[in-house]
Amino acid sequence: LAIAMSDSVIQCQEAFGAFEGKKKEPDLRVMMGLWPNVVQIVTTEDTGIKTFADIKGKRVGVGAPNSGVELNARMIFEANGMSYDDAKVDYLSYGEAIDQIKNGQCDVAFVTSGLGNATIKELGTMKKIRFIPIDGKAIENLTKKYPFYMPYSIPKTSYDTEVDTPTAAVMNVMLVDKKLPDDVVYDILTGIYSEKGLATIGASHATAKREIKLDTG
């Protein structure tokens, strides 16, 4: 069993992106979807950055090399018609990038996580934060080329910002090998989706209580 973001899983299955040049892994199977990892591109009001285009020439923490955050950052630059060459990119984890924002050494941090991220909240106690939107042509480009992304929104109540911010998200999934016996899969899912299992998961994080609507169309 493993937990991974769906974008990383597809890249691994089909050997592209971070897995370019490696063998394909067609035996990977998603057993269940878990929670949305929300792309949160955070900056502070004193930078003057309001749109993705404003990132040009700025200091941007994009995540550790080939991490889930960094893979998201690379694709989102692409969706906006830009590349890392357009900014002063630093391969920092989002915690490190946010620390540098506090110290005035970084302008923007890519964070891919559930909403209510503690490091972003801490930054918000020190500076007025703002999220850079992913909308319009950018979200259209992103979801068309990489359909594992979905449009999402960061509610203003999540971090006490002035407005809701349109963005993108990818699902975290529970991953197994296709050789895992069906009865084992059944037992795992039965345990998770039992009344006790759902109560335990729901108590772990606010996003775990949100239902995902299934569309038969």
Regions found by a protein language model. Give the residues of each.
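Alpha-to-beta junction loops
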Residues: 1-4, 59-60, 102-111, 126-130
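Bilobed "Venus flytrap"/periplasmic-binding protein-like clamshell domains
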Residues: 1, 33-103
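Solvent-exposed coil/turn segments that connect beta secondary-structure elements
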Residues: 6-9, 36, 44-47, 65, ...
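C-terminal lobe and pocket-closing loops
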Residues: 130-187
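An extracytoplasmic/periplasmic, membrane-proximal ligand-sensing/linker region
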Residues: 92, 96, 103, 113-131, ...
